Amino acid sequence: MSIQSFSCVDTETLFTTGKSARFSNFKSVAERKLAQLDAAPSVGFMRAPPGNDLKEYDGAWHVRINDQWRLTFKWGDAGPYDVLIEDPH
């Protein structure tokens, strides 16, 4: 299922153009996680690899990008939406 919407302009720009100064330190990992999310047939697909550390908090799902950053999204009938890369700490 394709990503339905983004709640962060920088995350959307990285996904659509491959460019983002804000996420330059971990750009390739973030792009890989976004591509995986875009292709995911279900939220459970994001459990692999185990390093993704998929967790649900307050109605949103979180996938680990690195020690500081997470790919956060909600999952509906049409797939992932409100996708953003954030520092939850």
What residue spans do the PLM features occupy?
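Arg/Lys-rich, positively charged N-terminal/basic patches that mediate binding to nucleic acids
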Residues: 1-33
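Glycine-rich, flexible loop/turn motifs
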Residues: 2, 19, 42, 50-53, ...
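Alpha-helical interaction segments
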Residues: 4-5, 13, 47, 59-65
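Short secondary-structure boundary micro-motifs
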Residues: 20, 39-40, 57-58
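Compact soluble domain cores
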Residues: 25-52
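Enriched for short, Lys/Arg-rich terminal
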Residues: 52-89
